[in-house]
Amino acid sequence: MRKLRSISAALTMAAGSLAAGAMAPQPAVALTPPVAMTADSLPTWQTNGIVFAMAQANGTVFTGGTFSSVRPSGEAAGGPNEREAVNFAAFDAATGAPTDCRLSFTVGSGTATVRALAVSPDGATLYAGGFFGAVNGTPVSSLAAIDIATCTVRTDFAVAVNATVRALAATADTVYLGGDFSSVDGQPHDNFAAVTTSGDATSFTANGDAPGRALEITPDGANVVLGGDFDRVNGTSSHALAVVDATTGAVVKGYGSSFIPSTSVVKDITTDATGVYTGNEGTGGGVFDGRIALNLSDFNQRWRDTCLGATQSVEVYKSVLYSGSHAHDCSTMNEYPNQRRKHLLAESVDNPAKLGWFPDTNDGLGEGIGPRVMAVSSSGGTDYMWVGGEFTTVNGVAQQGLTRFSSGPDTGVPTTPNVNASSVTPGSVKVRIQTSLDLDDSSLTYRVYKNGAATPVYTTTASSLPWVRPQLTWTDTDVTAGATYTYRVTASDGTNTTVKSPTQTVTAATTPEAYPTQVLTDGATLYWRYNETANTFVADNSPADDGGNHVGGPTRGVSPGAIAGNGSTAVTYNGTTQWSYSDAKRNRPNSYSIETWFRTTTTTGGKIVGFGDRTTEASATTDKHVYMTNAGRLIFGVRSGSNRTITTSGAYNDGEWHHVVATQGSSGMRLYVDGSLQASNFLITGGNDYVGYWHVGGDNLSGWTSRPTSNYFAGSIDETAIYPSVLSASQIAQHYNLGKNG
C-alpha cells in the first residue's frame, strides 16, 4: 500500500556545537536539510478507533481501519459534528476534512476491519483489503475494488479471499495481496497471491508458511518484496523477508534466520529509486524492531537501524526515510538509552543516524503502539505527510487516529534557551547556554544580547537533538571588575525565533574565586555548581561543556551553599522522584575522581553521585558511585566482575555540609570524607566496561551492599566535579579547606 514517491540528494546533518571565536557561523534555516517535512501538526479530522491503512490519489487521502465515526480536530468523541464512518474515510489532503466519498465496510459475523489500501497507477481505482463481507451493502469477500471517481464498488472485480487481507500493491494489470488466507477464489494460495485488475487468476505463486503482512513492487515492476511472519516461501527458507519474481512468484532472493531473528517479523515495506526499506517488529528477547535499507540493485543490506520499539510503517520523502514506531532504546545506534518512547523518526536513506524531526504521538489504544501507517499526498504545491494509528494525542494535544504534517511553512518555535552566567576570574564573564529543542530543526542559531542592547554581541549556530542538547559557552572579556552586566539569549531556526531568555545578572569578579579556580586548575571535566535558580539546566563550569538536566523538579537556588563566603547556591532533592544526569554519553573512565558536597538528615539513604547507562529512567547498569546507607554511612562502589565496595565507619547524616571524594586508579579504590581518607582497597584497579552518564541525586542501587531504603537521596548537594585522573590526598585536603574556610 504505497503512496507518493519523491527523490532528492541527501545532505549530511550537522552535529555538535561551535566554539567561541570560530569563524562566523552560517545562520540556521527552517527545516534542517535533508529534512523537508515540518513537525507542526495540522488541523485534521480524527477517528474514534484505529487507523491501519492509507493510500492517496490526486490530493485525496484514503484511510481504513477499525472505527465507526470521524469528527473535527479539537472535538471530543460524541461531539455535535461527529459523523458515521464505518472502517473507512476519505479526506482532502490539504484541509484535513472529509470528502463526499463515504463507504461502509461491514461483515455479517465478527468485527469488520480494513487493513490494506492501494491505488492503481492511473489513480482511477482504490483496492481495499481486510476482513469484511460488504461495501455499502454490495457483497464482497475481504477484497474490493472502488472506482474513485464515483466512489462506488466495482462489481466486475469479484475476488473471494477466505481470510484477512493485510497487504496490497497494484500495477496497471495486477493486484498483489498478502495476509492470513489459504485460498483465493477457491484455489489454494497460502498468505500471498495475485489477481488481474479484472479479478481473474494469474500464474503467480508465492506460498508462505505464515501470514503475510507487507509487500511492495520494485520500481521496474520485475519483482515483489514480501514481508511477514513466514519462515519459508515456496519451500525455500527465508524468514520474514523475501524477493520474488513478479510474474511467477519464484524466489529471487531469500534471507536466512540470521538476517532477521526468528523473534521478529516485517510489518511494512517501501521503495525508492535505489532502495528497499523495511519496518520490523519483534516479540520477546533478542528482537529486531528497527529498520533495514537494502540496495535495489542486489537486495543486499545498505544499513540497519537496531533501535528497539516496534516499527509499523516506513515512508520515503525526498531521500529521507520517515517511520512510525515506539522507539524507546537507540543505545545500539550510539543515540539515546532506554527512555520515554519516540513515535515518529527520520533518517537518511543512505545513513541510519537520526535526523532532526521529532513530532510525537502517544501509544494510544489497542496494543498501545502509536502510529501504524503513513502516506504522502500533494495538493496545491504543498506536500502533506499523513499518519494514522491508535494514538490519542499528537505533540501533546488531544488528536485521535489521524494527523498530518506539511512541507511548509514551518511555524514551530524552538524552546527558549536555558542560560547561566557567572564570573569566577577577573576580566571575564562566562555565558553558558543549553541548546534549545526544535522538533524539525536540529541546527539553530543563538544570539547573545548584553545589557539590553538590540544588537547581539555574539552569534553562533549549533546542533541539538532531544536526547543530546550540547552546552555552548561564550566568554565575554569586555567587562570591568566589579561592574554588573545582564545577558539574554534567543534561538532561531531561520524563520521562527524565541523570546529572549530570562535575564542573567552578573557582577564581574574583582579577585579569583578560590574554590572553583582550584577545581578547574586540577582538571575537572565536569563541574556543576548548581547556581541556577530556575529551569531544568545544570551548567557545566568545566571546559568540557558537559551540562546536565534536572528530572522531577529538585529545588534550585538553595542558600547557603556548601562553599563558605562565596554566595553560591545548592540543589535539594526530595529522595523519591528527583535526580540530575549529564547530557553527554561517556566511555567508562579508567582513572577518575568523583567529588561533591552534601548535607542531609535522611534515614533512608540514597545515591549521591554515580555512573549509569540511562538518563530519564533508572539505569540497568550502575557503578562508580557514592551512596549513603540508612544509617548515614557512605559507600563507594565499583563493578569489577562483581560489586566491590568500601564503606566509612562513621555516619554523615547530621545536617552539616560534608565533602566526599571517591577515587579509583592504579592504586585501587579510596574514599575521603572532609579531607581525610576513610576507606580504601588497593586491589580493585578496574571496572566493567560500558558507556553511560553521570547521575546526581539518585539512580538504581539494586544488588549493592547495604542497599538503602531509597535509591534517591533526600538532601542538598553542591559543587559536583568529575576528574579524569586520581586526585592526590593533598589536593583533596586543599579542596576541603578551601570549601570550609573560603
Predicted regions and their residues:
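Extracytoplasmic low-complexity segments
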Residues: 506-576, 618, 679, 732-742
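Residues within well-ordered beta-strands of beta-sheet-rich folds
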Residues: 432, 488-490, 527-531, 591-599, ...
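Extracellular glycan-recognition modules
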Residues: 79-80, 525, 534-538, 576-635, ...
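Short, aromatic/His-centered strand-loop micro-motif at the edge of beta-sheets
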Residues: 636-659, 707
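Short surface loop/edge beta-strand patches of beta-sandwich-type extracellular domains
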Residues: 512-519, 572-592, 645-651, 708
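Extracytoplasmic surface signature
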Residues: 2-10, 19-512, 520-524, 652, ...
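Extracellular acidic, Ser/Thr/Pro-rich low-complexity tracts
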Residues: 435-441, 493, 532-546, 600-602, ...
